């Protein structure tokens, strides 16, 4: 991205001319607040309105590798319209989306100040959260949120997500920005605790993880057209297990480089020799007996209607994207239910001169 374009984007942000969000165009009657006090943050489907106030400019501009934490107040309203204000410490996080040349807004990490937490707060179960800010347009946030919802259907050992409508108030300059459509993500420790597990931080090979969950995860990544992951480097993967004796389960996250999301910056690594992220490539390890996939294929077939309905029923996506995505899903189901194409696609890691064993390292230096 050219420097002049970066400057233009920054000026647009701080003069309040960020493109109008998809959410702002939706009739609020279709998104009821609900009784937020009777459920946790991720038990609700409605878009949550929040306001972040503090030295927002310094927070968003601090994109160094060792970014500092900045005090930020998080405001939202309960069902009775009572405003709740919580103290937090926020900092930029991530790799690709953290860079100015890639995204207008960087992803944020939220740490709640426990001494300030109210018992009735919607966030009382949270100590940390990830906040995905809109990178280039709100519609891609919505698309990625739907991908998290797909994986939630596959297994509870998955990260939960909730859309949030964000207003930014810079208390130093008195400028406000928004609304922006973002996404709150469940923190790793909470996800692990919810499933009676703990994080596993040692490096493993794919074959050393739980076979059933790995196949479900790898086929899911194939479904969404995502190749930006690896077990070996924990690239967009977290590992969890009940104890040191249990085989680890791989949990995927960060799907913005998938074909089903279709972000404008998403490109497959050149080593995979793919034309675009819309071209699928199965990236599991070599399995020659296709019967080993039977249980996984049965699972995806059982979930087919539910997966399709996520897109059919979603009022936040436009009709063009809905139709193209349903067609993309049709291609997936045609593949897994045809023995010949299944063997060709899922047997790719066994191909001697193929790229099936390429390990995605991402932006890591180790």
Predicted regions and their residues:
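Bacterial Sec-dependent N-terminal signal peptides
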Residues: 1-26
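Phosphate/dinucleotide-binding and metal-coordinating scaffold of catalytic cores
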Residues: 23-366
